[in-house]
Amino acid sequence: MTGIPSIVPYALPTSRDLPANLAQWHIDPERAVLLVHDMQRYFLRPLPDALRDQVVGNAARIRQWAADNGVPVAYTAQPGSMNEEQRGLLKDFWGPGMKASPTDREVVDALAPQPGDWLLTKWRYSAFFNSDLLQRLHASGRDQLILCGVYAHVGVLISSVDAYSNDIQPFLVADAIADFSKEHHWMAMEYAASRCAMVITTDEVVL
């Protein structure tokens, strides 16, 4: 069966749950960009209310920190109502996807893009695919990417791998991402910490 599965409530990770990081990078506001990944109504709708509220709340805290510290903010958002060519192989795993209506496409109010933010159309798992994200990072002299959003083991993780592959240091914010299950969430954290990224908490970003 294609599409986003039913999601059972689970507790977000705390600092005690994080896997050991191999890399020892540190966020520098002069080098970083925040990526708000796919926080559209369509993708957040399947999440249990408490989980959704926590993830959105933590992402909003990071969004405010970015604004306060001059850190650019990038958003990915699928366009909705893709035709067959645009949808490609996504349809074999996820079905037709979202509609282009605001009830599906809009980023949730608490994280709504602001003037000057980078708006990227999302076509595949990676935020870098068929977008100018890498060019924007290079043009702004930024080589760190802080990631929050959904879904952890799909687009968030693949975007982290793509950042790493382009010598951009990814920081995966463990309690500002969500997934289909605790197992998927933990798998994404463990892979990221051991293969491509730093896994950190919201407090480590904003405090």
Curated annotation (Swiss-Prot):
Lineage: Bacteria, Pseudomonadati, Pseudomonadota, Gammaproteobacteria, Pseudomonadales
Stated name of the protein: Phenazine biosynthesis protein PhzD
Pathway(s): Antibiotic biosynthesis; phenazine biosynthesis
GO MF: isochorismatase activity
Enzyme Commission designation: 3.3.2.15
Role description: Involved in the biosynthesis of the antibiotic phenazine, a nitrogen-containing heterocyclic molecule having important roles in virulence, competition and biological control. Catalyzes the hydrolysis of the vinyl ether functional group of 2-amino-2-deoxyisochorismate (ADIC), yielding pyruvate and trans-2,3-dihydro-3-hydroxyanthranilic acid (DHHA).
Impact reported for residue 38 to A: Loss of hydrolase activity
Keywords recorded for this protein, A-Z: Antibiotic biosynthesis, Hydrolase, Virulence
Enzyme class: hydrolase
Known partners and oligomeric status: Homodimer.
Family membership: Belongs to the isochorismatase family.
Chain positions recorded as substrate binding sites: 78, 87, 122, 151-155
Active site: 38
Species, as recorded: Pseudomonas fluorescens
Biological process annotations from GO: phenazine biosynthetic process
Catalytic reactions of this protein: (2S)-2-amino-4-deoxychorismate + H2O = (5S,6S)-6-amino-5-hydroxycyclohexa-1,3-diene-1-carboxyate + pyruvate
